[in-house]
Amino acid sequence: MTSQDFDLVVIGGGPSGYAAAFAAVAADLKVALIERDRVGGTCLHRGCIPAKELLETAAVHRTVVQAGEYGIDAQEPVIDFSVAQERKRAVVERLFAGITHLVGSKAITLLEGTGRLAGDHAVEISFN
């Protein structure tokens, strides 16, 4: 078993986790960030961001449907779900790349695995 010392170990690389890691690094702490999947967490990859992108597609559709109320003659819009899905995927990937770049550009040790508290001042990691 390998042991490393950190001032702060963050379990979970979602929005709160990476924000905590960034703040700790800014305070000159030695930081490890443990993430079992992809930095950004559920919010970025399967939750908040993908849902908001699809809601934005629906909002644009609604705006086009209501365009006639403003004197704009627009034909009935049709949502191409494959295009909406591709846009959603591209947005998620762009944000993921940005977060990954930020983590890599700071003095944060990214550990890919599942972390759990293992006693006073100890974290155990099951690596992927």
Model-derived features: positions:
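Beta1/beta-strand and adjacent pyrophosphate-binding region of the FAD-binding site
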Residues: T2-S16
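Short alpha-helical segment within the catalytic ATP-binding CA
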Residues: A19
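Glycine-rich flavin
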Residues: S3-F6, F22-L29, I34-N128
